[in-house]
A protein has these predicted regions:
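Bacterial N-terminal signal peptides
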Residues: 7-15
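Metal-dependent de-N-acetylase/amidase catalytic core
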Residues: 19-48, 130, 134-298
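Active-site rim/loop-helix segments in enzyme catalytic domains that contact anionic ligands
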Residues: 19-151, 180-184
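A broad, structure-centric signal for solvent-exposed, well-ordered loop/edge residues
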Residues: 7-8, 112, 251
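Short, charged N-terminal helix-start/capping segments
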Residues: 14, 80-92, 170-175, 227
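Positively charged n-region of N-terminal signal peptides that target proteins for export
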Residues: 1-4
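General helical structural elements
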Residues: 6-7, 295
């Protein structure tokens, strides 16, 4: 039995090692180079807050968050409840990798959209001018503002406020609110870090690969719809990059802790992460990219 277990363990390791080639991974990796981030290295106040719509939204910044945790930062995440006990429970397990605390905004999906019905594809973008008629903005904004000011973070991590990564209305809604609250001095972190992709990553992962995947399943690509609706060329360009290769094992463990449905969703934007071991995968995808926003100078 012991010998059989060793053989099975070796076989599993072999599958992960050979599941996808370095050449194939490199096809989707960033080719651009940006300045290395300095602010997070020198900050003496070490409190970070992640404000996102959904539990799995920090996937593309989870290496950086793991690194900060190792450096003694206190980290809290605020996001909507999924309305699914199994999914929320999986998030609580995943959160232990780099979070000190996670708090759910207790408004389930069917109650967040005022126009909710079975015909709606919830991830498809909507005009920003319609947010006030589609969401209870006053309630959502009040909760988020209160929670941010109670925690008083040094840094807030969000998705970008222009298209929320790939156009999901709830991504845009929360990221834009945090951005505007920061600019209007309603909240007082020292920096906003918006997780973004480089142009080459967007072209290869979101424009090409995601469009083909969605087309096979008969669904529209929200990213392409968001570009057209918001009149954008893509996400905002990064200001900095952060090398996260030293946190490869923790980031891979975080990504794989989610339930199967969420792992498939993450796989749209983090290609082939389930078909490789951490060391090989993050030797290629070894950087995370951020737009950094500083306080307004009055």
């Amino acid at each position: 039995m012991k010998r059989l277990n060793i053989i099975l363990l070796f076989f599993s390791f072999y599958l992960f090692s050979c599941g996808v080639s370095i050449k194939k991974l490199n096809k989707y990796a960033a080719i651009e180079v940006y300045p290395e981030d300095e602010f997070l290295k020198i900050s003496t106040s070490k409190k970070a807050m992640i404000v996102v719509a959904h539990d799995d939204d920090p996937a593309a910044m989870s290496g950086t968050l793991t690194m900060l945790k190792k450096q003694g930062w206190k980290i809290k995440q605020l996001c909507f409840t999924s309305g699914n006990q199994s999914r929320d429970s999986a998030m609580l397990i995943a959160s232990k990798i780099f979070l000190d605390e996670i708090e759910f905004i207790n408004i389930p999906p069917q109650m967040r959209r005022l126009d909710f019905d079975s015909s709606i594809i919830p991830y498809m973008p909507i005009p920003k001018s319609e947010f006030s008629s589609k969401f209870d903005l006053e309630k959502i904004h009040s909760i988020v503002l209160t929670k941010i000011n109670e925690f008083a973070p040094t840094v807030i991590f969000t998705l970008d406020n222009e298209m929320g990564g790939y156009g999901h209305p709830e991504h845009v809604l929360l990221s834009e609110f945090v951005f505007n609250a920061f600019k209007n001095n309603q909240i007082n972190p020292e920096r906003l870090y918006q997780s973004v992709y480089t142009n080459s990553m967007e072209d290869k992962i979101l424009k090409d690969r995601l469009t083909n995947q969605m087309k096979k399943w008969g669904f529209p690509n929200s990213y392409m719809s968001a570009l057209k609706m918001y009149k954008l060329d893509g996400m905002p360009e990064p200001d900095v990059q952060i090398n996260i290769e030293s946190c490869a094992e923790e980031k891979m463990r975080y990504l794989r802790t989610f339930n199967e449905r969420e792992r498939k969703t993450i796989g749209f934007y983090v290609p082939y992460f389930e078909k490789s071991n951490a060391k090989k995968y993050f030797s290629v995808f070894n950087r995370e990219f951020f737009r950094v926003i500083k306080p307004s100078i009055n």
